[in-house]
């Protein structure tokens, strides 16, 4: 990804009246995963300084019950399968109390590509967070037109050889 648009593992594109942030990073090491939310390929869209599409939020300053609830849902602004997050979190309260947000199964970013030309910005990324359980790779493509306030997106599930069953 073009480092001019990447902050950490977030890709940020800002136009006059529109901003978009896309999470294109691998989960952190367990020692740094205390507040991780598992929203890989999730995005936030701001138009005219108003949030249009947003994530469920960062739980660092919430109560432990709200933080756990935030992590337990797959309701981030990204694709999910069968109400299952792309990462699996430790559900043992004692372990979470001592170590924070522990991940049992992590995803891996497979591809990440940012391109730009005179007409648009384009971001494509994919991860394997659903491969082990469902046999699919999740790919997200987002295109933002430069001259108009338009955004186009596509989510794809690509079947792998490890696919135990097909989705309807």
Language-model region placement:
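Catalytic and substrate-binding regions of extracellular carbohydrate-active enzymes
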Residues: 1-167
């Amino acid at each position: 990804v073009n480092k001019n648009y990447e902050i950490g593992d977030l890709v940020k594109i800002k136009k006059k009246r529109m901003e978009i942030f896309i999470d294109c990073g691998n989960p952190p090491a367990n020692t740094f995963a205390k507040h991780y939310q598992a929203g890989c390929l999730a995005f936030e869209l701001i138009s005219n300084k108003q949030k249009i599409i947003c994530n469920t939020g960062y739980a660092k300053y919430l109560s432990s019950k709200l933080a756990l609830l935030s992590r337990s849902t797959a309701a981030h602004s990204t694709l999910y399968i069968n109400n299952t997050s792309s990462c699996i979190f430790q559900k043992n309260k004692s372990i979470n109390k001592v170590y924070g947000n522990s991940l049992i199964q992590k995803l891996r970013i497979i591809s990440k590509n940012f391109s730009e030309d005179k007409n648009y910005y384009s971001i494509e990324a994919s991860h394997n967070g659903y491969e082990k359980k469902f046999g699919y790779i999740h790919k997200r493509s987002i295109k933002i037109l430069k001259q108009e306030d338009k955004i186009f997106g596509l989510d794809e599930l690509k079947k792998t050889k490890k696919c135990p069953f097909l989705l309807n």
